[in-house]
Amino acid sequence: MSDSAGGRAGLRRYPKLPVWVVEDHQEVLPFIYRAIGSKHLPASNISFLHFDSHPDLLIPVNMPADTVFDKETLFGELSIENWIMPAVYAGHFSHVIWFHPAWAQQIREGRHHFLVGKDTSTTTIRVTSTDHYFLSDGLYVPEDQLENQKPLQLDVIMVKPYKLCNNQEENDAVSSAKKPKLALEDSRNTASTNCDSSSEGLEKDTATQRSDQTCLEASCSCSSENQECQTAASTGEILETLKKGKAFVLDIDLDFFSVKNPFKEMFTQEEYKILQELYQFKKPGTNLTEEDLVDIVDTRIHQLEDLEATFADLCDGDDEETVQRWASNPGMESLVPLVQSLKKRMEVPDYEMVHQAGLTCDYSELPHHISTEQEIEYLIQSVHYLLKNLPNPTLVTIARSSLDDYCPSDQVDTIQEKVLNMLRALYGNLDLQVYAAESPPS
């Protein structure tokens, strides 16, 4: 856990590790910008370690790219799902590692290299990645359509909970006095069909080599130009990458440990099924040309724009004639039973919320896994064993994500305390700042 050398020369150091706790995840960004302004973080080449059940790597669809250079305006434009990429385009983050639990599979496992830049035709932020995560939101553009390009290395790595070697009948709780053995679990290959990926433990740094291993899914290396993948990544490789960078931020969403899909409780099973039909994104095949990809994105953008217009119109009036008019469009037939069902359950349906829920129903559902106490403890230990072999972060940001019901409200306080205790065990005394019920600084 020693500080990396060289790259951090010239940066100021905090006396104690600052830990910022917020409610909504985008609220951590002002603290990161504050650290850049105070010279505790560099203005560029920051590595960002992101433990979360959601990637948060979307982009405000209609936000002008230059908004990133006006931080006050920027902070007001961001939401929980799209706050990281603007910091990439601004030049601050060059390397993002998304550590995710087994139940979160939104982005193809492995190492991705792509560009983030300004779309010359729309002046918005777009990417060259062809992963379904970006295609389904209409965010892909060809490289020659981007200006002010910023390269991004994105590593997507699964963290699996360890299993105690002890007999659990004799050990109802994890004992801090006993050192758990981290055992690798067999897992299905979560990479794309043309990725060779295997399950293997990430190697520890040679200076701290142990017989126990952190449970991480081996990753594969992918790029938008070449979709061939090679098995890669070890804690040693992560360590070397962090040493090359100037500094890194450790970011933890408490829903990493236990997560809900709040929309599943807002809608009936049949309503949710209809939303999936209306908003579905059919995964494209492989070996697509640039022209194919552009056509796919254009079609998807038109689909989403039509759906947005539909539900915006229904906000003004959901009489039968209006519903039938929209339902007459291709692929919109199921709008009629959806509206009928909503109106039976509520006097005035919130069609804006219906549209927001629909946007999450593209090629996969939002992750939903309410963890047991034991599962939470196992994940805490896996994260602990990963972090103990990495350099110290410059700062830590934590999002509770409970008011919007992503992290279960009856578990969030317990998870937060476990995470803070883990951080204290790793880094000693913390400079803890809790802003969960307040507005973050500007």
Curated annotation (Swiss-Prot):
InterPro entries: UPF0489 (IPR024131). It comes from the Eukaryota. Residues 175-208 are annotated as: Disordered. Residues 189-200 have a biased composition (Polar residues). Belongs to the UPF0489 family. This is UPF0489 protein C5orf22 homolog. The lineage of its organism: Eukaryota, Metazoa, Chordata, Craniata, Vertebrata.
